């Protein structure tokens, strides 16, 4: 006979790493070309003028300028870079 009970198991004890999503450069902030403006899953916010879209749906600046968020077609949010 065992003098200690069995260890048992649990289905808890895991957690995923944080993904650090969200806005990285707020509206009316100055950015350089290549600066990440927004990290997201899917295209909740679309790139507008002078903004590019990465393969993981990251929006980044194509030119030096100022970040400007606006409502585009069908009330979808867009991010523009106004060149400085």
Swiss-Prot record:
Coiled coil: none annotated. Signal peptide: none annotated. Residues 1-20 are annotated as: Disordered. The keyword Ribosomal protein applies. It comes from the Bacteria. Pfam families: Ribosomal_L27. GO terms for cellular component: ribonucleoprotein complex; ribosome. Keywords: Ribonucleoprotein, Ribosomal protein. One of its GO terms (biological process) is translation. GO terms for molecular function: structural constituent of ribosome. Belongs to the bacterial ribosomal protein bL27 family. HAMAP family: Ribosomal_bL27. This is Large ribosomal subunit protein bL27.
């Amino acid at each position: 006979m065992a003098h200690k009970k069995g260890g048992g198991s649990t289905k808890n004890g895991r957690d995923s790493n944080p993904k650090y999503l969200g806005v990285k450069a707020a509206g009316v902030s100055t950015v350089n070309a290549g600066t990440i403006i927004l990290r997201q899953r899917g295209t909740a916010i679309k790139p507008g003028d002078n903004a590019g879209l990465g393969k993981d749906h990251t929006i980044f600046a194509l030119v030096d300028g100022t970040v400007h968020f606006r409502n585009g077609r069908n009330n979808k949010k867009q991010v523009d870079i106004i060149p400085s």
